[in-house]
Amino acid sequence: EFLNSSVKIVNPIMGVKFWDENVRIPAEEVTVRFERGHPVALNGQTFSDDVELLLEANRIGGRHGLGMSDQIENRIIEAKSRGIYEAPGMALLHIAYERLVTGIHNEDTIEQYHAHGRQLGRLLYQGRWFDPQALMLRDALQRWVASEITGEVTLELRRGNDYSILNTVSDNLTYKPERLTMEKGESVFSPDDRIGQLTMRNLDITDTREKLFNYVESGLISSGNAGLPQVANPLLQDKSAK
């Protein structure tokens, strides 16, 4: 656990020494398919149970050293610890799942998904997976986020956590590039529309500017710098008044 010892002292159990130039790791393409948030196939192959799928994901990711991480973390006892972890299969599934999430759900849903995910991860770490607060979060994430995650993601894995996403396919994608193009041709989005949107956004910026002037007048921030707002010390104000 000493910080002057790097990942290079580790003999991987699930992966390979991707940092060793003598270890040959050819690039590999892999396609992951999800149905309603559940991983169901790797490279078109389905599996009899979830464990077999994860074991195969471990083998695929492990060939590249995917999912090795060096973590300094906080234990339940409030002491910090440091460890090097391997999770090649989970890393592979996570990359593909997150790609579909960002292509399917809107910004606010994704923000809540990440916030709930962090809370749920903490509860899992504390051994509270079946507590009511965890069940509430799991139900919300499965019902409103995972239920829409159906599709395929193709990646090229190289060395370690070096990869490229090659393709994303889903009938549920809300990302539609043809909606946003401003090139010539049929489009629901024109340069004039963009100008109008920026004009409306500028109204909010104007409101914010007025608030900043109010903050300057009240002494919360200085007009001479762009520093963080400072709340005036009432004791100092009383002394200056005297």
Curated annotation (Swiss-Prot):
The keyword Ion transport does not apply. GO terms for cellular component: cytoplasm. The keyword Transit peptide does not apply. It catalyses: L-citrulline + L-aspartate + ATP = 2-(N(omega)-L-arginino)succinate + AMP + diphosphate + H(+). Its EC number is 6.3.4.5. InterPro entries: Arginosuc_syn_C, Arginosuc_synth, AS_cat/multimer_dom_body, AS_multimer_C_tail. Pathway: Amino-acid biosynthesis; L-arginine biosynthesis; L-arginine from L-ornithine and carbamoyl phosphate: step 2/3. Keywords: Amino-acid biosynthesis, Arginine biosynthesis, ATP-binding, Cytoplasm, Ligase, Nucleotide-binding. It is found in: Cytoplasm. It is an enzyme of class 6 (ligase). One of its GO terms (molecular function) is protein homodimerization activity. One of its GO terms (biological process) is urea cycle. Homotetramer. Belongs to the argininosuccinate synthase family. Type 2 subfamily. This is Argininosuccinate synthase.
